[in-house]
């Protein structure tokens, strides 16, 4: 099975995979190379999740602005 790029995954799917990786790493039964690969994947998932959270926070901030006379601005997600 091909592994999806973290930036192409939903936030929920990334968190679910990250949770599974943490469980595997905490178990301590992995060879060093396997543990490093899973750690790298986990870092990628965490960064992608943080980026999605930052984008959502920006969207919420735009929607909750109190200035009724302000023009709507385009949402520009952070480049990955």
UniProtKB/Swiss-Prot annotation:
Disulfide bonds: none annotated. Its EC number is 3.1.11.6. It is an enzyme of class 3 (hydrolase). One of its GO terms (molecular function) is exodeoxyribonuclease VII activity. InterPro entries: Exonuc_VII_S, Exonuc_VII_ssu_sf. It is found in: Cytoplasm. One of its GO terms (cellular component) is cytosol. It catalyses: Exonucleolytic cleavage in either 5'- to 3'- or 3'- to 5'-direction to yield nucleoside 5'-phosphates. Pfam families: Exonuc_VII_S. Keywords: Cytoplasm, Exonuclease, Hydrolase, Nuclease. One of its GO terms (biological process) is DNA catabolic process. Belongs to the XseB family. Heterooligomer composed of large and small subunits. Bidirectionally degrades single-stranded DNA into large acid-insoluble oligonucleotides, which are then degraded further into small acid-soluble oligonucleotides. NCBIfam families: PRK00977.1-1, PRK00977.1-4, xseB. HAMAP family: Exonuc_7_S. This is Exodeoxyribonuclease 7 small subunit. It comes from Vibrio atlanticus (strain LGP32) (Vibrio splendidus (strain Mel32)).
């Amino acid at each position: 099975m091909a592994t999806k790029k973290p930036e192409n995954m939903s936030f929920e799917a990334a968190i679910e995979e990250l949770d599974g990786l943490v469980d595997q790493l905490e178990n301590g039964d992995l060879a060093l190379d396997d543990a490093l690969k899973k750690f790298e994947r986990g870092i990628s998932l965490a960064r992608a999740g943080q980026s999605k959270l930052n984008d959502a926070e920006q969207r919420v901030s735009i929607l909750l602005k109190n200035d009724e006379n302000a023009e709507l601005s385009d949402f520009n997600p952070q480049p990955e």
